[in-house]
Amino acid sequence: ADPELPVAIGGYAMIPLPQYADVVMENGAGRYFDIFNVHAYRAIRDYPAIMENVRSYMERHGIADRPLWFTENGTDSEGSGRVSSVIAGMKAHSPEQELLVSEILPKVMITMQSFGVDRDFFFVLPPYNERNGNKDWGLMRRDFTVKPGFVVFSTLTDRLGSAVYLGAMELGDGIRGFLYRQPDGSQTLVYWSVTGIETESNRPDRDFKDLYRRGFTLDVKDGVYTGCNAFGTPFEVKAADGKLKLEATRLPAFLSGLSGLTPAVPFRAVAKRGASADGFDRTIVF
């Protein structure tokens, strides 16, 4: 084994973190891992409280300087599968539920990044059922064709995979915006309309009928700007007289080639390290 590889503690799957997690740290586990690891399957509106609980725990046990990973992050916001699958006894997402997941995935990941989460792993890529076959997980169907959420995940990675998060923008009522800096110094704005996915608890009857179209304006230099929607379809928009008119929907869009924008809520990145090299013998023999 490579002693230089970072070590993540086994993921805690209960939020709020149970007393057991405190006992683990009281027995010296903090010397043996570099990355704190959590699982979460909650509505987006619950994530501020989740982060408060996790951050409080990390502060309490002197590990606030460790990277924070969510190695499982899934959702019940679309409810149990509504249609039959190709396997008897297994339910599958309806087309509407697939679109709901394609909305949830990028909103969760970008929101978590804005909270300072270092890595977020969506659950799960392959087709997978639980709860007596009623809960359909996975960004692939049983025939291994991809769902819309897979495509949106691909767009998210393509547009922001090498970017640095700068902070949140104020774009108007019912609209969220997040600003990123690309390796070439240009800026990318991600924006979307707020829906019940973000403000309500999980509901089994949620639908995708309303796109929640909302207009807003950016103060930018005149010229033509390019971007794409959540599925990677490109678009062009033209700014005139220092104004750029845009429309947000419930699915995120990505606007590229920006410059000079300042986030209303700047992100303050904190340097993080693993377990300190304190001379303690942390050799583990299996």
Q: Residue ranges of each PLM-predicted region?
A:
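Carbohydrate-binding surface patches
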Residues: E170-K221
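Solvent-exposed beta-hairpin/edge-strand motifs
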Residues: T217-P234
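C-terminal beta-strand-rich structural cap/linker in extracellular carbohydrate-active enzymes
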Residues: E236-G274
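Aromatic/acidic polysaccharide-binding cleft in carbohydrate-active enzymes
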Residues: T75-S154, G167-I175, P183
